[in-house]
Amino acid sequence: MASKNSASLALFFALNILFFTLTAGTNCRCNPSPKPRPLPNPKVPSPKVPTPSVPSPYVPTPSVPSPSVPTPSVPSPSVPSPNPTPVIPPRTPGSSGNCPIDALRLGVCANVLSGLLNVQLGQPSPQPCCSLIQGLVDLDAAVCLCTALRANVLGINLNVPISLSVLLNVCNRRLPSNFQCA
């Protein structure tokens, strides 16, 4: 027991010496002297000195009538613009492979997919899911459903290519050839 007390006492003195050594080594004054307050300087307005105004002398200009000469009208030549605007062909809607639908709205397709895989009792209606992708080209519909499946918006971890083709078949859509849901 005496060894524990002596070890605790030795640790106390070691920390005490370390503390006072570090505080003394910082060369910090304990009582900083207060800063003297500056005396307020009253603002004295500067006197306004009027600027002398000197009138400019009047110089009369002789009035000479100008001869009346008709000016011929010359048509200005049309200059072609240096940078012609390129003609951009009109974009066909749906051929871009972009999804114009918010992927979170495709969560209604989860009921269709889970009902087809016998995860849910009863037959869910594919109408809400199919109505979302109804106006899209097959490529855009595939891109939208692929995005929803990859982001796991549907909440089901499945084989993405099989799930994609199942959802498209339910809505009477075709998976475009050479389309890969990457």
From Swiss-Prot:
Disruption phenotype: Reduced cutin accumulation due to lower cutin biosynthesis. Early flowering in long-day conditions. One of its GO terms (cellular component) is chloroplast outer membrane. Residues 33-92 have a biased composition (Pro residues). Residues 33-94 are annotated as: Disordered. Sequence repeats lie at residues 42-46, 47-51, 52-56, 62-66, 67-71, 72-76, 77-81. Gene3D superfamilies: Plant lipid-transfer and hydrophobic proteins. It comes from the Eukaryota. GO terms for biological process: defense response to fungus. Residues 1-25 form the signal peptide. Keywords: Cell wall, Plant defense, Repeat, Secreted, Signal. Induction: Transient accumulation in response to a brief exposures to cold. It is found in: Secreted, Cell wall. The keyword Transmembrane helix does not apply. Residues 42-81 are annotated as: 7 X 5 AA repeats of P-[KS]-V-P-[ST]. SUPFAM superfamilies: Bifunctional inhibitor/lipid-transfer protein/seed storage 2S albumin (SSF47699). SMART domains: AAI. Probable lipid transfer protein (LTP). May improve freezing survival. Seems to control the flowering process and lignin synthesis. Confers resistance to Botrytis cinerea. Belongs to the plant LTP family. PEARLI1 subfamily. This is pEARLI1-like lipid transfer protein 2. It comes from Arabidopsis thaliana (Mouse-ear cress).
